[in-house]
Regions:
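His/Asp/Glu-rich metal-coordinating catalytic cores
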Residues: 1-127
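Binuclear metal-dependent phosphoesterase catalytic core
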Residues: 21-30, 107-171
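Short, glycine-/small-residue-enriched flexible loop/hinge segments at domain edges that mediate gating
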Residues: 175-176
Length: 176
C-alpha cells in the first residue's frame, strides 16, 4: 500500500499481479493462465512457490517467479518442476540461465547491472505450447564485463602494467 504502482494508471494491455499471495489471470485468446505475486516488503524469506499448483491444466500455465536466494523467496526447483507449469519465468538473478528439463529460466538482465555481472547478457526467446517448450538465449548487451587474469611482478612499473592491460583489453575486443 502507498506504492507508486498503486497510484499509477496502467495501460489497458498491462495486467498487474499486485497481491502478496500468488494469484492468476487467464488470457483466453492465448489459452494461457499466468500466475505471480508482488513483493510488499523488501525481503521475503518464505518459500512462496513451494506449494503452488496450476488450477487450469487445460491451458498453458506460466508462473512469473521473482526470487531464488535465502532473502528473496527461496526456490526449490524440484518442487516447482512438479507443480504442473508449462514454463516458469524467473527473475532476480542477473545471470541468464535456461533449464529446459525443469521448464524454467532466469532471464537475467539485458545489460550488465554492475561489474559483478560477468559474461553475456541478453534475453530469452521462447515458444510455449501444451506439446512442449523451446527456449533460446539471445545475446543483446552492448557491453560485457569479463574477468582478465593478470600477473603483476614486483619489478613492473605502472606504465608497463598499463600498457599490458590495454593490450589485453584490445585482444578481447575493445568495443565491449
Amino acid at each position: 500500500k502507498g506504492s507508486f504502482y498503486d497510484g499509477f494508471k496502467w495501460s489497458e494491455n498491462v495486467i498487474f499481479l499486485g497481491d502478496k499471495n500468488i494469484e492468476s489471470v487467464e488470457i483466453p485468446e492465448l489459452n494461457t493462465c499466468v500466475y505471480g505475486l508482488s513483493y510488499h516488503q523488501t525481503e521475503i524469506k518464505d518459500a512462496m512457490y513451494d506449494h503452488v499448483i496450476v488450477n487450469r491444466p487445460d491451458m498453458i500455465n506460466i508462473l512469473v517467479a521473482h526470487g531464488g536466494d535465502e532473502k528473496h523467496i527461496p526456490i526449490n526447483r524440484k518442487k516447482l518442476a512438479m507443480s504442473g507449469f508449462d514454463y516458469v519465468a524467473m527473475g532476480h538473478i542477473h545471470k541468464p540461465e535456461i533449464d529446459e528439463k525443469m521448464k524454467m529460466a532466469y532471464s537475467g538482465s539485458l545489460e550488465p547491472i554492475d561489474m559483478n555481472d560477468i559474461g553475456p547478457r541478453g534475453y530469452i526467446y521462447g515458444e510455449i505450447s501444451k506439446r512442449g517448450l523451446e527456449l533460446e538465449f539471445v545475446p543483446f548487451a552492448k557491453r560485457i564485463y569479463r574477468e582478465l587474469d593478470f600477473t603483476v611482478t614486483p619489478t613492473a612499473t605502472n606504465l608497463e602494467i598499463r600498457h599490458r592491460l590495454i593490450d589485453m583489453i584490445k585482444e578481447q575486443g575493445q568495443d565491449d
